[in-house]
């Protein structure tokens, strides 16, 4: 059966409060749409933790910088609904708002512009009434993806806060492929006293091991074949660590060389503490090896946890 689709914030809140008044637990799976098996696995996980599952589909302009093409982000809403219906148990509601940043008094469209501090803000082109309140995890947002995408996690933390306030879930499920994002949301929930349980779902991979991502569609067939150097080198590094090679620089060099030889362009390759995301020189406890690399127009990320 097709899920209920809600686009209005007040209607979404009303639905959630009605369900919770009946004693139902609600799990939220936030997405930007163009769903793949990785997203569907989050929905399946959500069913294990709640009575009802809500999926949000919203391409968040707040996490895009002026140099990133927001309009080019892939979308297929009807296809997304069909995929959600294929999951056992389906979903109970899809929250698909038009614009969560449109605060203009005359209904003008929100647009992304570059502020004086070099970061994106959503403002209303016509009236000047815009969004200027942001949520930030000051330390966790700076390493890894934060170096090359300085506005990204501010946008993520803010939109997730808005979704939490609108949907009012008991549980929220995030994929650990976006490891830094997952850690930031965990910290945000703790620091801001949200009464929400945050679940981290394991990375879902293609048959050849490539981490599933909506951005994989940007890869040419040749680039797609070469991109598996990311996951293959990460798994080799984990095996080397388990065999006693715990010097991080040597493991990083192994991964960088493999990806570079395959034609990739490294954004970062770092081994960090699983909790605070700080770099480590030697593996002496739980760490995560995080990689970001470009193949053609696609910027891909992946990671692997190493627990020695």
From Swiss-Prot:
InterPro entries xrefs: Pantoate_ligase (IPR003721), Pantoate_ligase_C (IPR042176), Rossmann-like_a/b/a_fold (IPR014729)
Pathway membership, UniProt: Cofactor biosynthesis; (R)-pantothenate biosynthesis; (R)-pantothenate from (R)-pantoate and beta-alanine: step 1/1
Entry EC no(s): 6.3.2.1
CDD domains, A to Z: PanC
Activity vs pH: Optimum pH is 7.8. Activity decreases sharply with increasing acidity and is null at pH 7. There is only a slight decrease toward higher pH.
Tissue-level expression: Expressed at low levels in leaf and root.
Keywords: ATP-binding, Cytoplasm, Ligase, Nucleotide-binding, Pantothenate biosynthesis
Enzyme class: ligase
Matches recorded under Pfam families: Pantoate_ligase
Domain of life of the organism encoding this protein: Eukaryota
Any one Gene Ontology molecular-function term assigned to this protein's record: ATP binding
Subcellular location: Cytoplasm
A GO biological-process term: pantothenate biosynthetic process
Reaction(s) catalysed by this chain's protein: (R)-pantoate + beta-alanine + ATP = (R)-pantothenate + AMP + diphosphate + H(+)
Record propeptide residues: 2
Any single Gene Ontology cellular-component annotation: cytosol
Subunit structure: Homodimer.
Family, as annotated: Belongs to the pantothenate synthetase family.
UniProt-listed PANTHER family: CYTIDYLATE KINASE/PANTOATE-BETA-ALANINE LIGASE, PANTOATE--BETA-ALANINE LIGASE
Name listed for the protein in its UniProt record: Pantoate--beta-alanine ligase
Organism placement in taxonomy: Eukaryota, Viridiplantae, Streptophyta, Embryophyta, Tracheophyta
Gene name per UniProt: PANC
């Amino acid at each position: 059966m097709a899920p209920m689709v809600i686009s209005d914030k007040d209607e979404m809140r009303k639905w959630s409060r009605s369900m919770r008044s009946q004693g139902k637990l609600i799990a939220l799976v936030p997405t930007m749409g163009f769903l793949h098996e990785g997203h569907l696995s989050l929905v399946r996980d959500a069913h294990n933790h709640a009575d009802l599952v809500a999926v949000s589909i919203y391409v968040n302009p707040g996490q895009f910088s002026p140099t990133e093409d927001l309009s080019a982000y892939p979308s297929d809403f009807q296809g997304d609904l069909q995929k959600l219906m294929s999951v056992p148990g389906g979903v109970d509601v899809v929250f698909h708002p038009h614009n969560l940043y449109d605060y203009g008094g005359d209904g003008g469209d929100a647009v992304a512009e570059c502020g004086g501090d070099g970061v994106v803000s959503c403002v209303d082109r016509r009236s000047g009434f815009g969004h200027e309140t942001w949520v930030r995890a000051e330390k966790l947002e700076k390493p890894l993806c934060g170096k090359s995408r300085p506005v990204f996690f501010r946008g993520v933390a803010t939109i997730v806060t808005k979704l939490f306030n609108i949907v009012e879930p008991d549980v929220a499920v995030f994929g650990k492929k976006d490891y830094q994002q997952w850690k930031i949301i965990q910290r945000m929930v703790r620091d801001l006293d949200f009464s929400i349980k945050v679940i981290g779902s394991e990375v879902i991979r293609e048959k050849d091991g490539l981490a599933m991502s909506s951005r994989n569609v940007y890869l040419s067939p040749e680039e797609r074949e070469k991109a598996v150097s990311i996951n293959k080198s990460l798994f080799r590094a984990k095996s080397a660590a388990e065999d006693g090679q715990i010097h991080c620089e040597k493991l990083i060099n192994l991964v960088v060389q493999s990806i570079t030889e395959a034609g990739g362009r490294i954004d970062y390759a770092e081994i960090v503490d699983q909790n605070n995301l700080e770099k480590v020189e030697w593996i002496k406890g739980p760490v995560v090896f995080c990689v970001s690399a470009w193949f053609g127009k696609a910027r891909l990320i992946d990671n692997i946890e190493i627990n020695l």
